[in-house]
C-alpha cells in the first residue's frame, strides 16, 4: 500500500480528471435552453438569450455540423444507455444511424441529464471526502510544531536504540560465523571432531 501522500496525490489527480469529465459532459450533453430567470433579477433574460441552443434530441442534424472539441474527451452516454435496458437499444441504434459521424452528440433528455448530473456530483463528493479523510490521517495535522519536534526527537532516540541493537546482533553474528568457520576448518583437517554420532 502506498504512503498517505502518494494516495493523496493520486486522489487529487483523479479529482481533477473527474472535474474535467464533468465539465465536458455538462457542456456537451446539455441542450443550453434558457433557465427560468429568478424573479428578483429581471436582467437575466437578455443574458440567457445569448446562449446558443443545441438542436433538440428528436430533430436530425444537417451535414453542416462541426466537431465539438470537448466531445472526444468527455464521457459518452453509450455505455450507460446500453446498460439501461434492452428496450432502449433499438431506439439508441436508430438515433445513432440518423446522426452523421462528424456531428456533435445530441443533448440528453432532461431526465437523463439530471440523473447523470447527480451521479457526477455524487462521484465528486465521494472523491472529495476521500481526500478529506487522507488529510485528516496525515501525521501532525492536529499537533503544534513543538509537539512535532518532540515526536521527531523521540523517534530519533528509538531509532538510535534499534540501531545499537542491530549493531550488537551483527557483531554477535560475525563472532558466531568465525566460530563456525573455525569448526569447519577443524573438521576439514580431520582433527578434534569425530564423525561418529
Curated annotation (Swiss-Prot):
Signal peptide: none annotated. The keyword Transcription regulation applies. GO terms for cellular component: mediator complex. It is found in: Nucleus. Keywords: Activator, Coiled coil, Nucleus, Transcription, Transcription regulation. One of its GO terms (biological process) is regulation of transcription by RNA polymerase II. Pfam families: Med21. Residues 37-112 are annotated as: Disordered. The keyword Coiled coil applies. Residues 140-183 form a coiled coil. One of its GO terms (molecular function) is transcription coregulator activity. Residues 60-70, 90-100 have a biased composition (Low complexity). Component of the Mediator complex, a coactivator involved in the regulated transcription of nearly all RNA polymerase II-dependent genes. Mediator functions as a bridge to convey information from gene-specific regulatory proteins to the basal RNA polymerase II transcription machinery. Mediator is recruited to promoters by direct interactions with regulatory proteins and serves as a scaffold for the assembly of a functional preinitiation complex with RNA polymerase II and the general transcription factors. Component of the Mediator complex. Belongs to the Mediator complex subunit 21 family. This is Mediator of RNA polymerase II transcription subunit 21. It comes from Coccidioides immitis (strain RS). The lineage of its organism: Eukaryota, Fungi, Dikarya, Ascomycota, Pezizomycotina.
Amino acid at each position: 500500500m502506498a504512503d498517505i501522500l502518494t494516495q493523496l496525490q493520486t486522489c487529487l489527480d483523479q479529482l481533477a480528471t473527474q472535474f474535467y469529465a464533468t465539465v465536458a459532459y455538462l457542456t456537451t450533453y446539455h441542450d443550453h435552453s434558457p433557465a427560468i430567470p429568478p424573479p428578483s433579477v429581471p436582467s437575466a433574460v437578455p443574458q440567457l438569450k445569448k446562449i446558443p441552443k443545441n438542436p433538440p434530441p428528436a430533430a436530425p442534424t444537417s451535414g453542416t455540423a462541426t466537431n465539438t472539441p470537448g466531445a472526444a474527451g468527455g464521457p459518452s452516454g453509450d455505455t450507460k444507455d446500453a446498460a439501461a435496458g434492452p428496450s432502449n437499444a433499438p431506439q439508441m441504434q436508430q438515433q445513432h444511424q440518423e446522426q452523421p459521424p462528424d456531428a456533435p452528440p445530441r443533448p440528453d433528455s432532461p431526465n437523463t441529464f439530471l440523473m447523470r448530473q447527480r451521479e457526477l456530483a455524487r462521484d465528486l463528493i465521494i472523491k472529495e471526502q476521500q481526500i478529506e479523510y487522507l488529510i485528516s490521517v496525515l501525521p501532525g495535522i492536529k499537533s503544534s510544531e513543538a509537539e512535532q519536534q518532540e515526536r521527531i526527537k523521540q523517534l530519533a532516540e528509538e531509532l538510535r536504540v534499534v540501531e545499537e541493537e542491530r549493531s550488537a546482533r551483527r557483531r554477535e553474528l560475525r563472532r558466531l560465523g568465525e566460530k563456525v568457520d573455525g569448526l569447519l576448518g577443524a573438521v576439514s583437517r580431520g582433527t578434534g571432531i569425530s564423525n561418529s554420532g
